[in-house]
């Protein structure tokens, strides 16, 4: 169809010229029999009609193909981006520079690849048109063909320059654009609007949003004005070249060099050719611009991610548990270690509690255990095998974790809990059992559709839960992992009352009798239940032992315990 749309316009112009000559010849008969000319005119009309219908059908076919390709290609690129995201480490998402790459790639992913393909076919069509038109115009004058080709070059050069400038502006402003999107979310999402109203932040955030827009608008306005002005000037040059050719062809007809029909044909073909030159140069410029934006996608997709080389599914010492040997970790860009030479041994069946001030390294330790981070130095062993040698999927199936910033999935209740063990996520009996252990079954029964109730406010008929209820859903999700050898609760019960927490951890102890359990909590009523307690301070283990042993030491733990106990006196 591209070939047809490239050739047919020139053919239509040629037939139009023959039609005009046929009409002119019939008018010169001066009353003679001109039935033959009538037939000739009719043939040209029918031929041109057929060509127009063919051209229209080809254009519609192109539109159909583009519509189908837009959906398929857009989805394919988005899936590629998401598949790449699955291979990234947590540190990539916490790196603002790399996250900008992801945002830039996603912003243009659905439109630029198709745009590049469409412009490539447009260029192919325009080249065919120009070759066809050039053959006809060359019969009139070689200089006409040359004039046709050079008329649009200045406009192309200017547009190419401004496209590059626009791309560099967009790339430089990635962080500002991301801040705008964030401010939109804060002002419109249910999880942010409460504080926005209570602290009267609406006007403040809206002003920041508008200020960012105004800065971007001023830059874009300047670029658009310059782009438009130069486009107008060079457009005038193209128009002058056309009307020069227009007059040239007209005078040639007056002098009898060409017929009236040929004059009509050459004028039409020069107009078609001029449009084809402009279109082809625009396509080339658009391809250049699309390639600039697709470089964002290429940069993101080709970013090297360290290969997860581990292949082992079990360790040589099945009863050895977890060992941290002289482990340190430093966050990128930080001068101080988040963890400093940590050495811990946790045996199967042992419950470990970790206490310490916020920022002391407790959660970082868990992220190292789950290989969300890699140690800066030192080694971590599970069953006597270095974590780096474990198959990552096998390792993560052996660990069940609920972080303090757990996800509130906008899914139905059953799925919200069931995804804790994805292979049994549809097993309602397992889900209900996990909900009982997580103390969530009592309020789930009161929901409109019980385990089929939509949670959250994003979708129709969704029910929003309280903070404590969401935490019980998250705990239930952790209890789905029956096969996990290690279960970790990282401050997941902060919004639950002390009585409910005690009941939950009683279930937790029962569930983890022969497994490793790790609890991070600020509530000493929970912490004291653990077999072993370690105290973190500034990334180091400063105290460890059982609750009675640490109280007897009268150190940091005893001081924190007494401070909390005084609140209940």
Predicted regions and their residues:
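Hydrophobic patch in the ABC ATPase nucleotide-binding domain
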Residues: 87-90, 303-306, 440-444
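Cytosolic ends of transmembrane helices, especially the final helix of ABC transmembrane type-1 domains
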Residues: 172, 201, 225, 245, ...
């Amino acid at each position: 169809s591209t070939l047809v749309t490239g050739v047919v316009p020139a053919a239509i112009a040629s037939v139009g010229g023959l039609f005009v000559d046929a009409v002119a010849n019939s008018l010169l008969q001066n009353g003679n029999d001109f039935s033959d000319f009538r037939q000739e005119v009719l043939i040209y009309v029918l031929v041109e009609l057929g060509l127009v219908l063919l051209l229209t059908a080809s254009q519609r076919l192109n539109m159909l193909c583009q519509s189908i390709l837009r959906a398929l290609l857009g989805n394919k690129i988005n899936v590629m981006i998401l598949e790449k995201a699955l291979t990234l480490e947590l540190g990539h998402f916490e790196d603002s520079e790399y996250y900008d790459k992801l945002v830039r790639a996603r912003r243009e992913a659905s439109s630029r690849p198709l745009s590049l393909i469409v412009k490539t076919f447009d260029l192919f069509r325009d080249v065919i048109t120009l070759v066809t038109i050039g053959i006809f115009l060359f019969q009139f004058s070689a200089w006409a063909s040359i004039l046709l080709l050079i008329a649009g070059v200045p406009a192309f050069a200017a547009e190419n320059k401004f496209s590059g400038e626009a791309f560099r502006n967009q790339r430089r402003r990635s962080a500002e654009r991301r801040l705008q999107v964030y401010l939109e979310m804060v002002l419109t999402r249910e999880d942010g609007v409460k504080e926005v109203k209570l602290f009267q932040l609406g006007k403040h955030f809206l002003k920041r949003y508008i200020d960012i827009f105004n800065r971007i608008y001023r830059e874009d306005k300047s670029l658009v004005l310059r782009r438009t002005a130069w486009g107008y000037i060079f457009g005038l040059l193209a128009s002058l070249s056309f009307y020069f050719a227009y007059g040239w062809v007209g005078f040639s007809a007056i002098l009898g060099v060409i017929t009236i029909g040929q004059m009509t044909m050459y004028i039409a073909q020069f107009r078609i050719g001029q449009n084809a030159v402009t279109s082809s140069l625009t396509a080339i410029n658009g391809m250049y611009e699309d390639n600039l934006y697709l470089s964002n996608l290429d940069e993101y997709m080709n970013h090297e991610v360290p290969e997860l080389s581990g292949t082992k599914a079990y360790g040589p010492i099945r009863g050895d548990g977890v060992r941290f040997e002289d482990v340190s970790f430093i966050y990128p860009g930080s001068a101080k270690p988040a963890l400093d030479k940590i050495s811990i041994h946790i045996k199967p069946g042992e419950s470990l509690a970790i206490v310490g001030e916020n920022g002391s390294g407790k959660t970082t330790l868990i992220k190292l255990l789950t290989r969300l981070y890699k140690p800066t130095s030192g080694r971590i062993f599970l069953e006597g095998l270095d974590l780096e040698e474990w198959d990552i999927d096998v390792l993560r199936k052996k660990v069940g974790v609920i972080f303090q910033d757990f996800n509130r999935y906008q899914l139905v209740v059953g799925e919200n809990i069931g995804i804790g063990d994805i292979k049994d996520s549809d097993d309602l009996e397992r889900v209900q059992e996990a909900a009982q252990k997580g103390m969530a079954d009592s309020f789930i029964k009161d929901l409109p559709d019980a385990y089929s109730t939509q949670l959250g406010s994003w979708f129709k008929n969704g029910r929003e839960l309280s903070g404590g209820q969401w935490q019980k859903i998250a705990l239930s999700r952790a209890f789905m992992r029956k096969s996990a050898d290690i279960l970790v609760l990282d401050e997941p019960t902060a919004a639950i009352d002390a009585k409910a927490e005690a009941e939950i951890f009683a279930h937790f102890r029962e569930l983890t009798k022969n497994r490793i359990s790790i609890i991070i909590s600020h509530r000493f009523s929970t912490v004291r239940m653990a077999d072993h307690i370690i105290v973190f301070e500034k990334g180091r283990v400063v105290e460890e032992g059982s609750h009675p042993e640490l109280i007897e030491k009268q150190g940091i733990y005893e001081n924190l315990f007494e401070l909390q106990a005084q609140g209940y006196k």
